[in-house]
Amino acid sequence: LDKLVPKLIRRVKNQGFNAVIIDPIYKVITGDENNASEMGAFCNQFDKICTETGCSTIYCHHHSKGAQGAKRAMDRASGSGVFARDPDAQLDMIQLETSEEFINENADNLSATGWRLECSLREFPNFKPVNFWFDYPIHKIDTTGSLNKVYAEGDTKNNLSKSGKRSQTPDSRK
């Protein structure tokens, strides 16, 4: 990214763009993704793009390995916690666990998958999660509410819905 940023700024500056999108960032990452100091310097390059071009910088990143459902949206990013603390806004898409039977009953297409969009916003209240179907190549908001009680892998609510034995989560008992 260190070499890309000056070129990017020259090309984008004074062009009237609203945003620069870098997808995915792992292809331009400089330094160790798990090192906070190195990722802080890396993320400062995004600020430089914003400052010098007047554009927002949007980047796409991936989740860490393993089940993500028990984590907050801001804690799912792979690598250093800088990826949770640096952005002014994070949008996180997570796939929901849907059975074949559920898909048959609720989706328009048998190849569709259920997803949830969550956010973490620095200056504003977070919006409510948005559920949607991904039916290649289109994302469609779930207007029926069928995905409201479906959860991502690792979410404790998912385990409760499967067992049917308890209606409380550890958080609700506090």
State where each predicted segment sits.
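Conserved inter-motif catalytic segment of the P-loop NTP-binding fold
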Residues: 1-37, 41, 48
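General structural signal for secondary-structure boundaries
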Residues: 2-3, 36-38, 73, 97-98, ...
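Alpha-helical structural motif
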Residues: 4, 83, 115, 171-172
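Intrinsically disordered, low-complexity regions
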Residues: 17, 32, 67-70, 80, ...
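Phosphate-binding/switch region of NTP-binding enzymes
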Residues: 19, 36-143
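Conserved alpha/beta core segments of nucleic-acid transaction machinery
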Residues: 122-174
